[in-house]
Each structure stands twice: as C-alpha cells, then as structure tokens.
Regions:
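Small-residue packing motifs within transmembrane alpha-helices
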Residues: 2-3, 46
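Catalytic glycan-binding domains that act on GlcNAc-containing polysaccharides
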Residues: 19-164
C-alpha cells in the first residue's frame, strides 16, 4: 500500500500556495473486520430510544391498552398510572417536593424524567435486558416469557440504532 501525504503551506504575507510532497511506504496487512469482531457500545440513551420505538414508535400522544379503562398506558414510553404513583413514591422517599401528574405522561421530557427516576431507584446496577423486561412486565417482569419477546424487539431496535 502506498500512502501519499501532500501538505499545503500558505504564506500569509505573499498568499502563495506551495506544495510539498512526501512518499512513505507503509507495509501493513489489511485486516478485514467481521461484525462479531467489532464491539458495539450501547449507551443508556440508545436503550431509551429503543424502548420508545418499541412502545410507541416515538408518538408522545400514543394511547395503548384502551380496554384497561383508567389504567391506559400513554405517551412515548407508554406509562401507566401505577408508574406515575411509583415515581411519586420514590420522590417522596428521596424527600423531593416534585410530583408528577397523569397528564405528564404525554410530555416527552417528563416521561424521560420519570423513566430515569424509576430506573435509578430500582435498577441502578441492572443490565439493559433486566431494565427493559421490568419496564414492560413490572417488578418481576424479567421472569416472564412475554417480556423475553419484548426484549427481542428492543434488541432489534438497538441493532438498528447502532448501525450508523
């Protein structure tokens, strides 16, 4: 492989452009990387983005489970009233004066705040699979087969997000 480096020098006094060429032979084998050889780092933000895609396709106005009157999951992360109550309980334990209302589930910023409060309280050191499966299935969600299917959907979205 031959590498040609061509630096350009511009003199500010005469505004002349001069070219200086260097040739250097670099002997290195070309290494072909396979997808399994490349470690993809998935961030917490990637996880949240994937959850939003699975839950609502990014629709802040989404309403799911309409058959559960009064307990519908709504917003980008499909938050149920029980989750709002849980987040408010956590805030009370943390001696915070902040409280969320049901309508806050339609607000992307507040939805994300609620998610992180829940996650940091219950899943500070959990892996992404446990977080996703519990988000979908509740406190013991990681044990349910239905949440394993959910996790596969999240993984598929993560794969799409990390191929950039």
């Amino acid at each position: 492989m031959l590498l040609i480096v061509t630096p350009l020098f511009i003199s500010t006094q005469s505004l002349e452009v001069t070219e200086n060429c260097y040739e250097e032979r670099i002997e290195q084998p070309i290494v072909e990387l396979k997808p399994k050889d490349v470690q993809v780092v998935i961030s917490e933000q990637d996880l949240v983005s994937a959850l939003i895609l699975v839950e609502s396709r990014g629709n802040d106005s989404a309403i799911g489970d309409r058959h559960l009157v009064g307990e519908e999951a709504v917003g980008a992360l499909q938050i149920r009233p029980v989750m709002v109550r849980e987040v408010n309980r956590i805030l009370k334990i943390q001696k915070s004066d902040k409280r969320y209302k049901l309508k806050d589930r339609f607000d992307r910023e507040k939805t994300l705040e609620m998610f992180y409060i829940w996650k940091n309280y219950h899943h500070k050191d959990s892996d992404f699979e446990t977080i996703a499966r519990n988000w979908n299935g509740g406190p013991r969600g990681y044990k349910r087969n239905s949440t394993l299917r959910y996790w596969k959907k999240v993984q598929k979205e993560l794969d799409g997000l990390t191929v950039r």
